[in-house]
Amino acid sequence: IDLSKPLWTDIKGATDQFMLGDKHYVSVIRTDPAYVFVYNKQTMEDNGYDDPAELFKEGKWNWDTFTEMCLDFTDAESDKYALDGWYYEKALQQSSGVPLIGITDGKLVNNISDPMIAKAQNMMYELQKNNVVYPKHENNWKLRGDAEGIGMATGLTLFYPIGLWALENAPSTTVNYGDVSKGEVMFVPVPC
């Protein structure tokens, strides 16, 4: 593939991420965010929170704002947990902007001691310590209701980190997140 041709211009940067030495090993054809934080706008409003999409537009959607919402929302006695799903750890780790293992000048680099990775890990530790994550370990390692998104439409879950693929289906399969036709379901980039 000649990456200098116009067909490949938009994806050259992404394709270059898969180089080792001077060789490409993957040709990227499309990029999508691996994770977004899905939320229910009605739940945000009912709890008096600013809309995360608006916070993002204003440059105020970050780890601190996200953490404050999670800590405030969570009430285990009422079965309210800020986070549910399988992907929040990966999403937050990747939002540090530093891969655990990277490539610099064509060589593998271990970034485990990078300060941004430590910051992301400490944030996740604090979230877990404060029980903001639905306790799958107490529920036979199943999601709430044993299905993705359960708890969003009922106001029991604040954020559901997942790929956009979860919302790209028919309304009958996205009902767990809320009523799409009423504009209840929204997503925001993973905070950083």
Q: Predicted segment positions?
A:
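Short helices/loops that flank or line small-molecule/ion binding pockets
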Residues: M44, T65-D72, L143-Y160
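Extracytoplasmic "Venus flytrap"/periplasmic binding protein-like
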Residues: I1-D10, D46-N47, G151, L158-F159, ...
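Glycine-centered hinge/linker elements that transmit conformational signals in sensory
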Residues: T67-C70, D105-K142
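Extracytoplasmic/periplasmic substrate-recognition and gating elements
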Residues: Y177-C192
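Glycine-rich, aromatic-lined ligand/substrate-binding cores of catalytic
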Residues: I117-K129, A147-A166, A170
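Extracytoplasmic/periplasmic solute-binding protein
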Residues: F18-F37, E45, N62-N110, M116
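Aromatic-glycine-rich donor-binding/catalytic loop that engages nucleotide-sugar donors
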Residues: Q42-F56
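Short, solvent-exposed loop/beta-turn-alpha elements that line the ligand-binding surface or hinge
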Residues: D2-D10, E54-E58, V98-K119, C192
